[in-house]
UniProtKB/Swiss-Prot annotation:
Record-linked PANTHER family: UREASE ACCESSORY PROTEIN F (PTHR33620:SF1)
Location in or out of the cell: Cytoplasm
A molecular function GO annotation: nickel cation binding
Subunit composition and interactions: UreD, UreF and UreG form a complex that acts as a GTP-hydrolysis-dependent molecular chaperone, activating the urease apoprotein by helping to assemble the nickel containing metallocenter of UreC. The UreE protein probably delivers the nickel.
Coiled coil segments of this chain: none
Family stated for the protein in its record: Belongs to the UreF family.
GO cellular component terms listed in the entry, alphabetical order: cytoplasm
Alphabetically ordered keywords of this record: Chaperone, Cytoplasm, Nickel insertion
Name of protein: Urease accessory protein UreF
Length: 235
């Protein structure tokens, strides 16, 4: 009996591509950035597992849900439609919403690192030969969206992968700098898994005029991190 396996193989390849894109082993240097979390430890805002869970939930609700996640969906749709104007608009919008020099630097450097990796994998020419122009100074989310679209990863799965990668990175920071035990990190994952799904549902439902992060505490912590005397991370 002949069985058509092409759709299954295609979805499997997309899933594997997503797993590769969010892997901690991806050589783009994401491990070097804490997104302000190290400063929260230094300032005494986060000192235990419960406070860390509250911090991460706050960043998820007031940050990613209203900034990176909905814009990632828009950027991936722009890549699908070869909408160069939309790509430039949302890429610039993300840059404008990085409230400190370190957060802006993180986004830009990770985007450049991912572009270098794509070049090493001989994928960058596919961007240059496409119908949409790559925005000037593409940030990490913009390049992530292109690779997700190129690998035919559904938008919702792209968002799931992105938020999972964010959480893993934040918990890795906490395990190094807090320090947080690995079992405690797994408890926090269990606590935040359903909240990440809710965040994606919310992000996909937001209109353009509802977007924008509301994280004054993170911005203040990130700004103070620039002059923090002793630190492990670049943000």
């Amino acid at each position: 009996m002949h069985t058509n396996t092409e759709p299954t193989q295609s979805s499997d390849l997309a899933l594997l591509g997503l797993m590769q894109l969010i892997s901690p082993a991806l050589p783009i240097g994401a491990f070097a950035w804490s997104q302000g979390l190290e400063s929260a430890f230094e300032l005494g805002w986060v000192t235990n597992e419960q406070q860390l869970g509250e911090w991460l939930e706050g960043v998820l609700d007031d940050g990613l849900t209203r900034c990176e996640l909905p814009v990632l969906a828009r950027l991936q749709n722009c890549w699908a439609k070869s909408d160069s104007e939309g790509l430039s608009y949302w890429n610039d919008w993300l840059h404008a919403n990085r409230e400190t020099a370190e957060l802006s630097d993180e986004d830009t450097r990770l985007g450049l690192a991912l572009m270098r990796l794509l070049n090493s994998l001989q994928l960058q020419p596919q961007i240059e030969q496409g119908h949409a122009a790559l925005p000037q100074d593409p940030g990490y989310v913009t390049v992530f969206a292109w690779l997700a679209q190129q690998r035919q990863i559904p938008v919702r799965q792209s968002l799931l992968g992105f938020v999972w990668g964010w959480l893993e990175n934040q918990l890795a920071v906490a395990c190094k700098a807090m320090p947080l035990g690995h079992t405690a990190a797994q408890r926090l994952i269990e606590q935040l898994r359903p909240k990440m799904v809710i965040a994606i549902d919310t992000a996909l439902a937001l209109a353009d005029d509802q977007l924008g992060p509301i994280m004054p505490g993170l911005a203040l912590g990130s700004a103070q991190h620039e002059t923090q005397y002793s630190r492990l991370f670049r943000s």
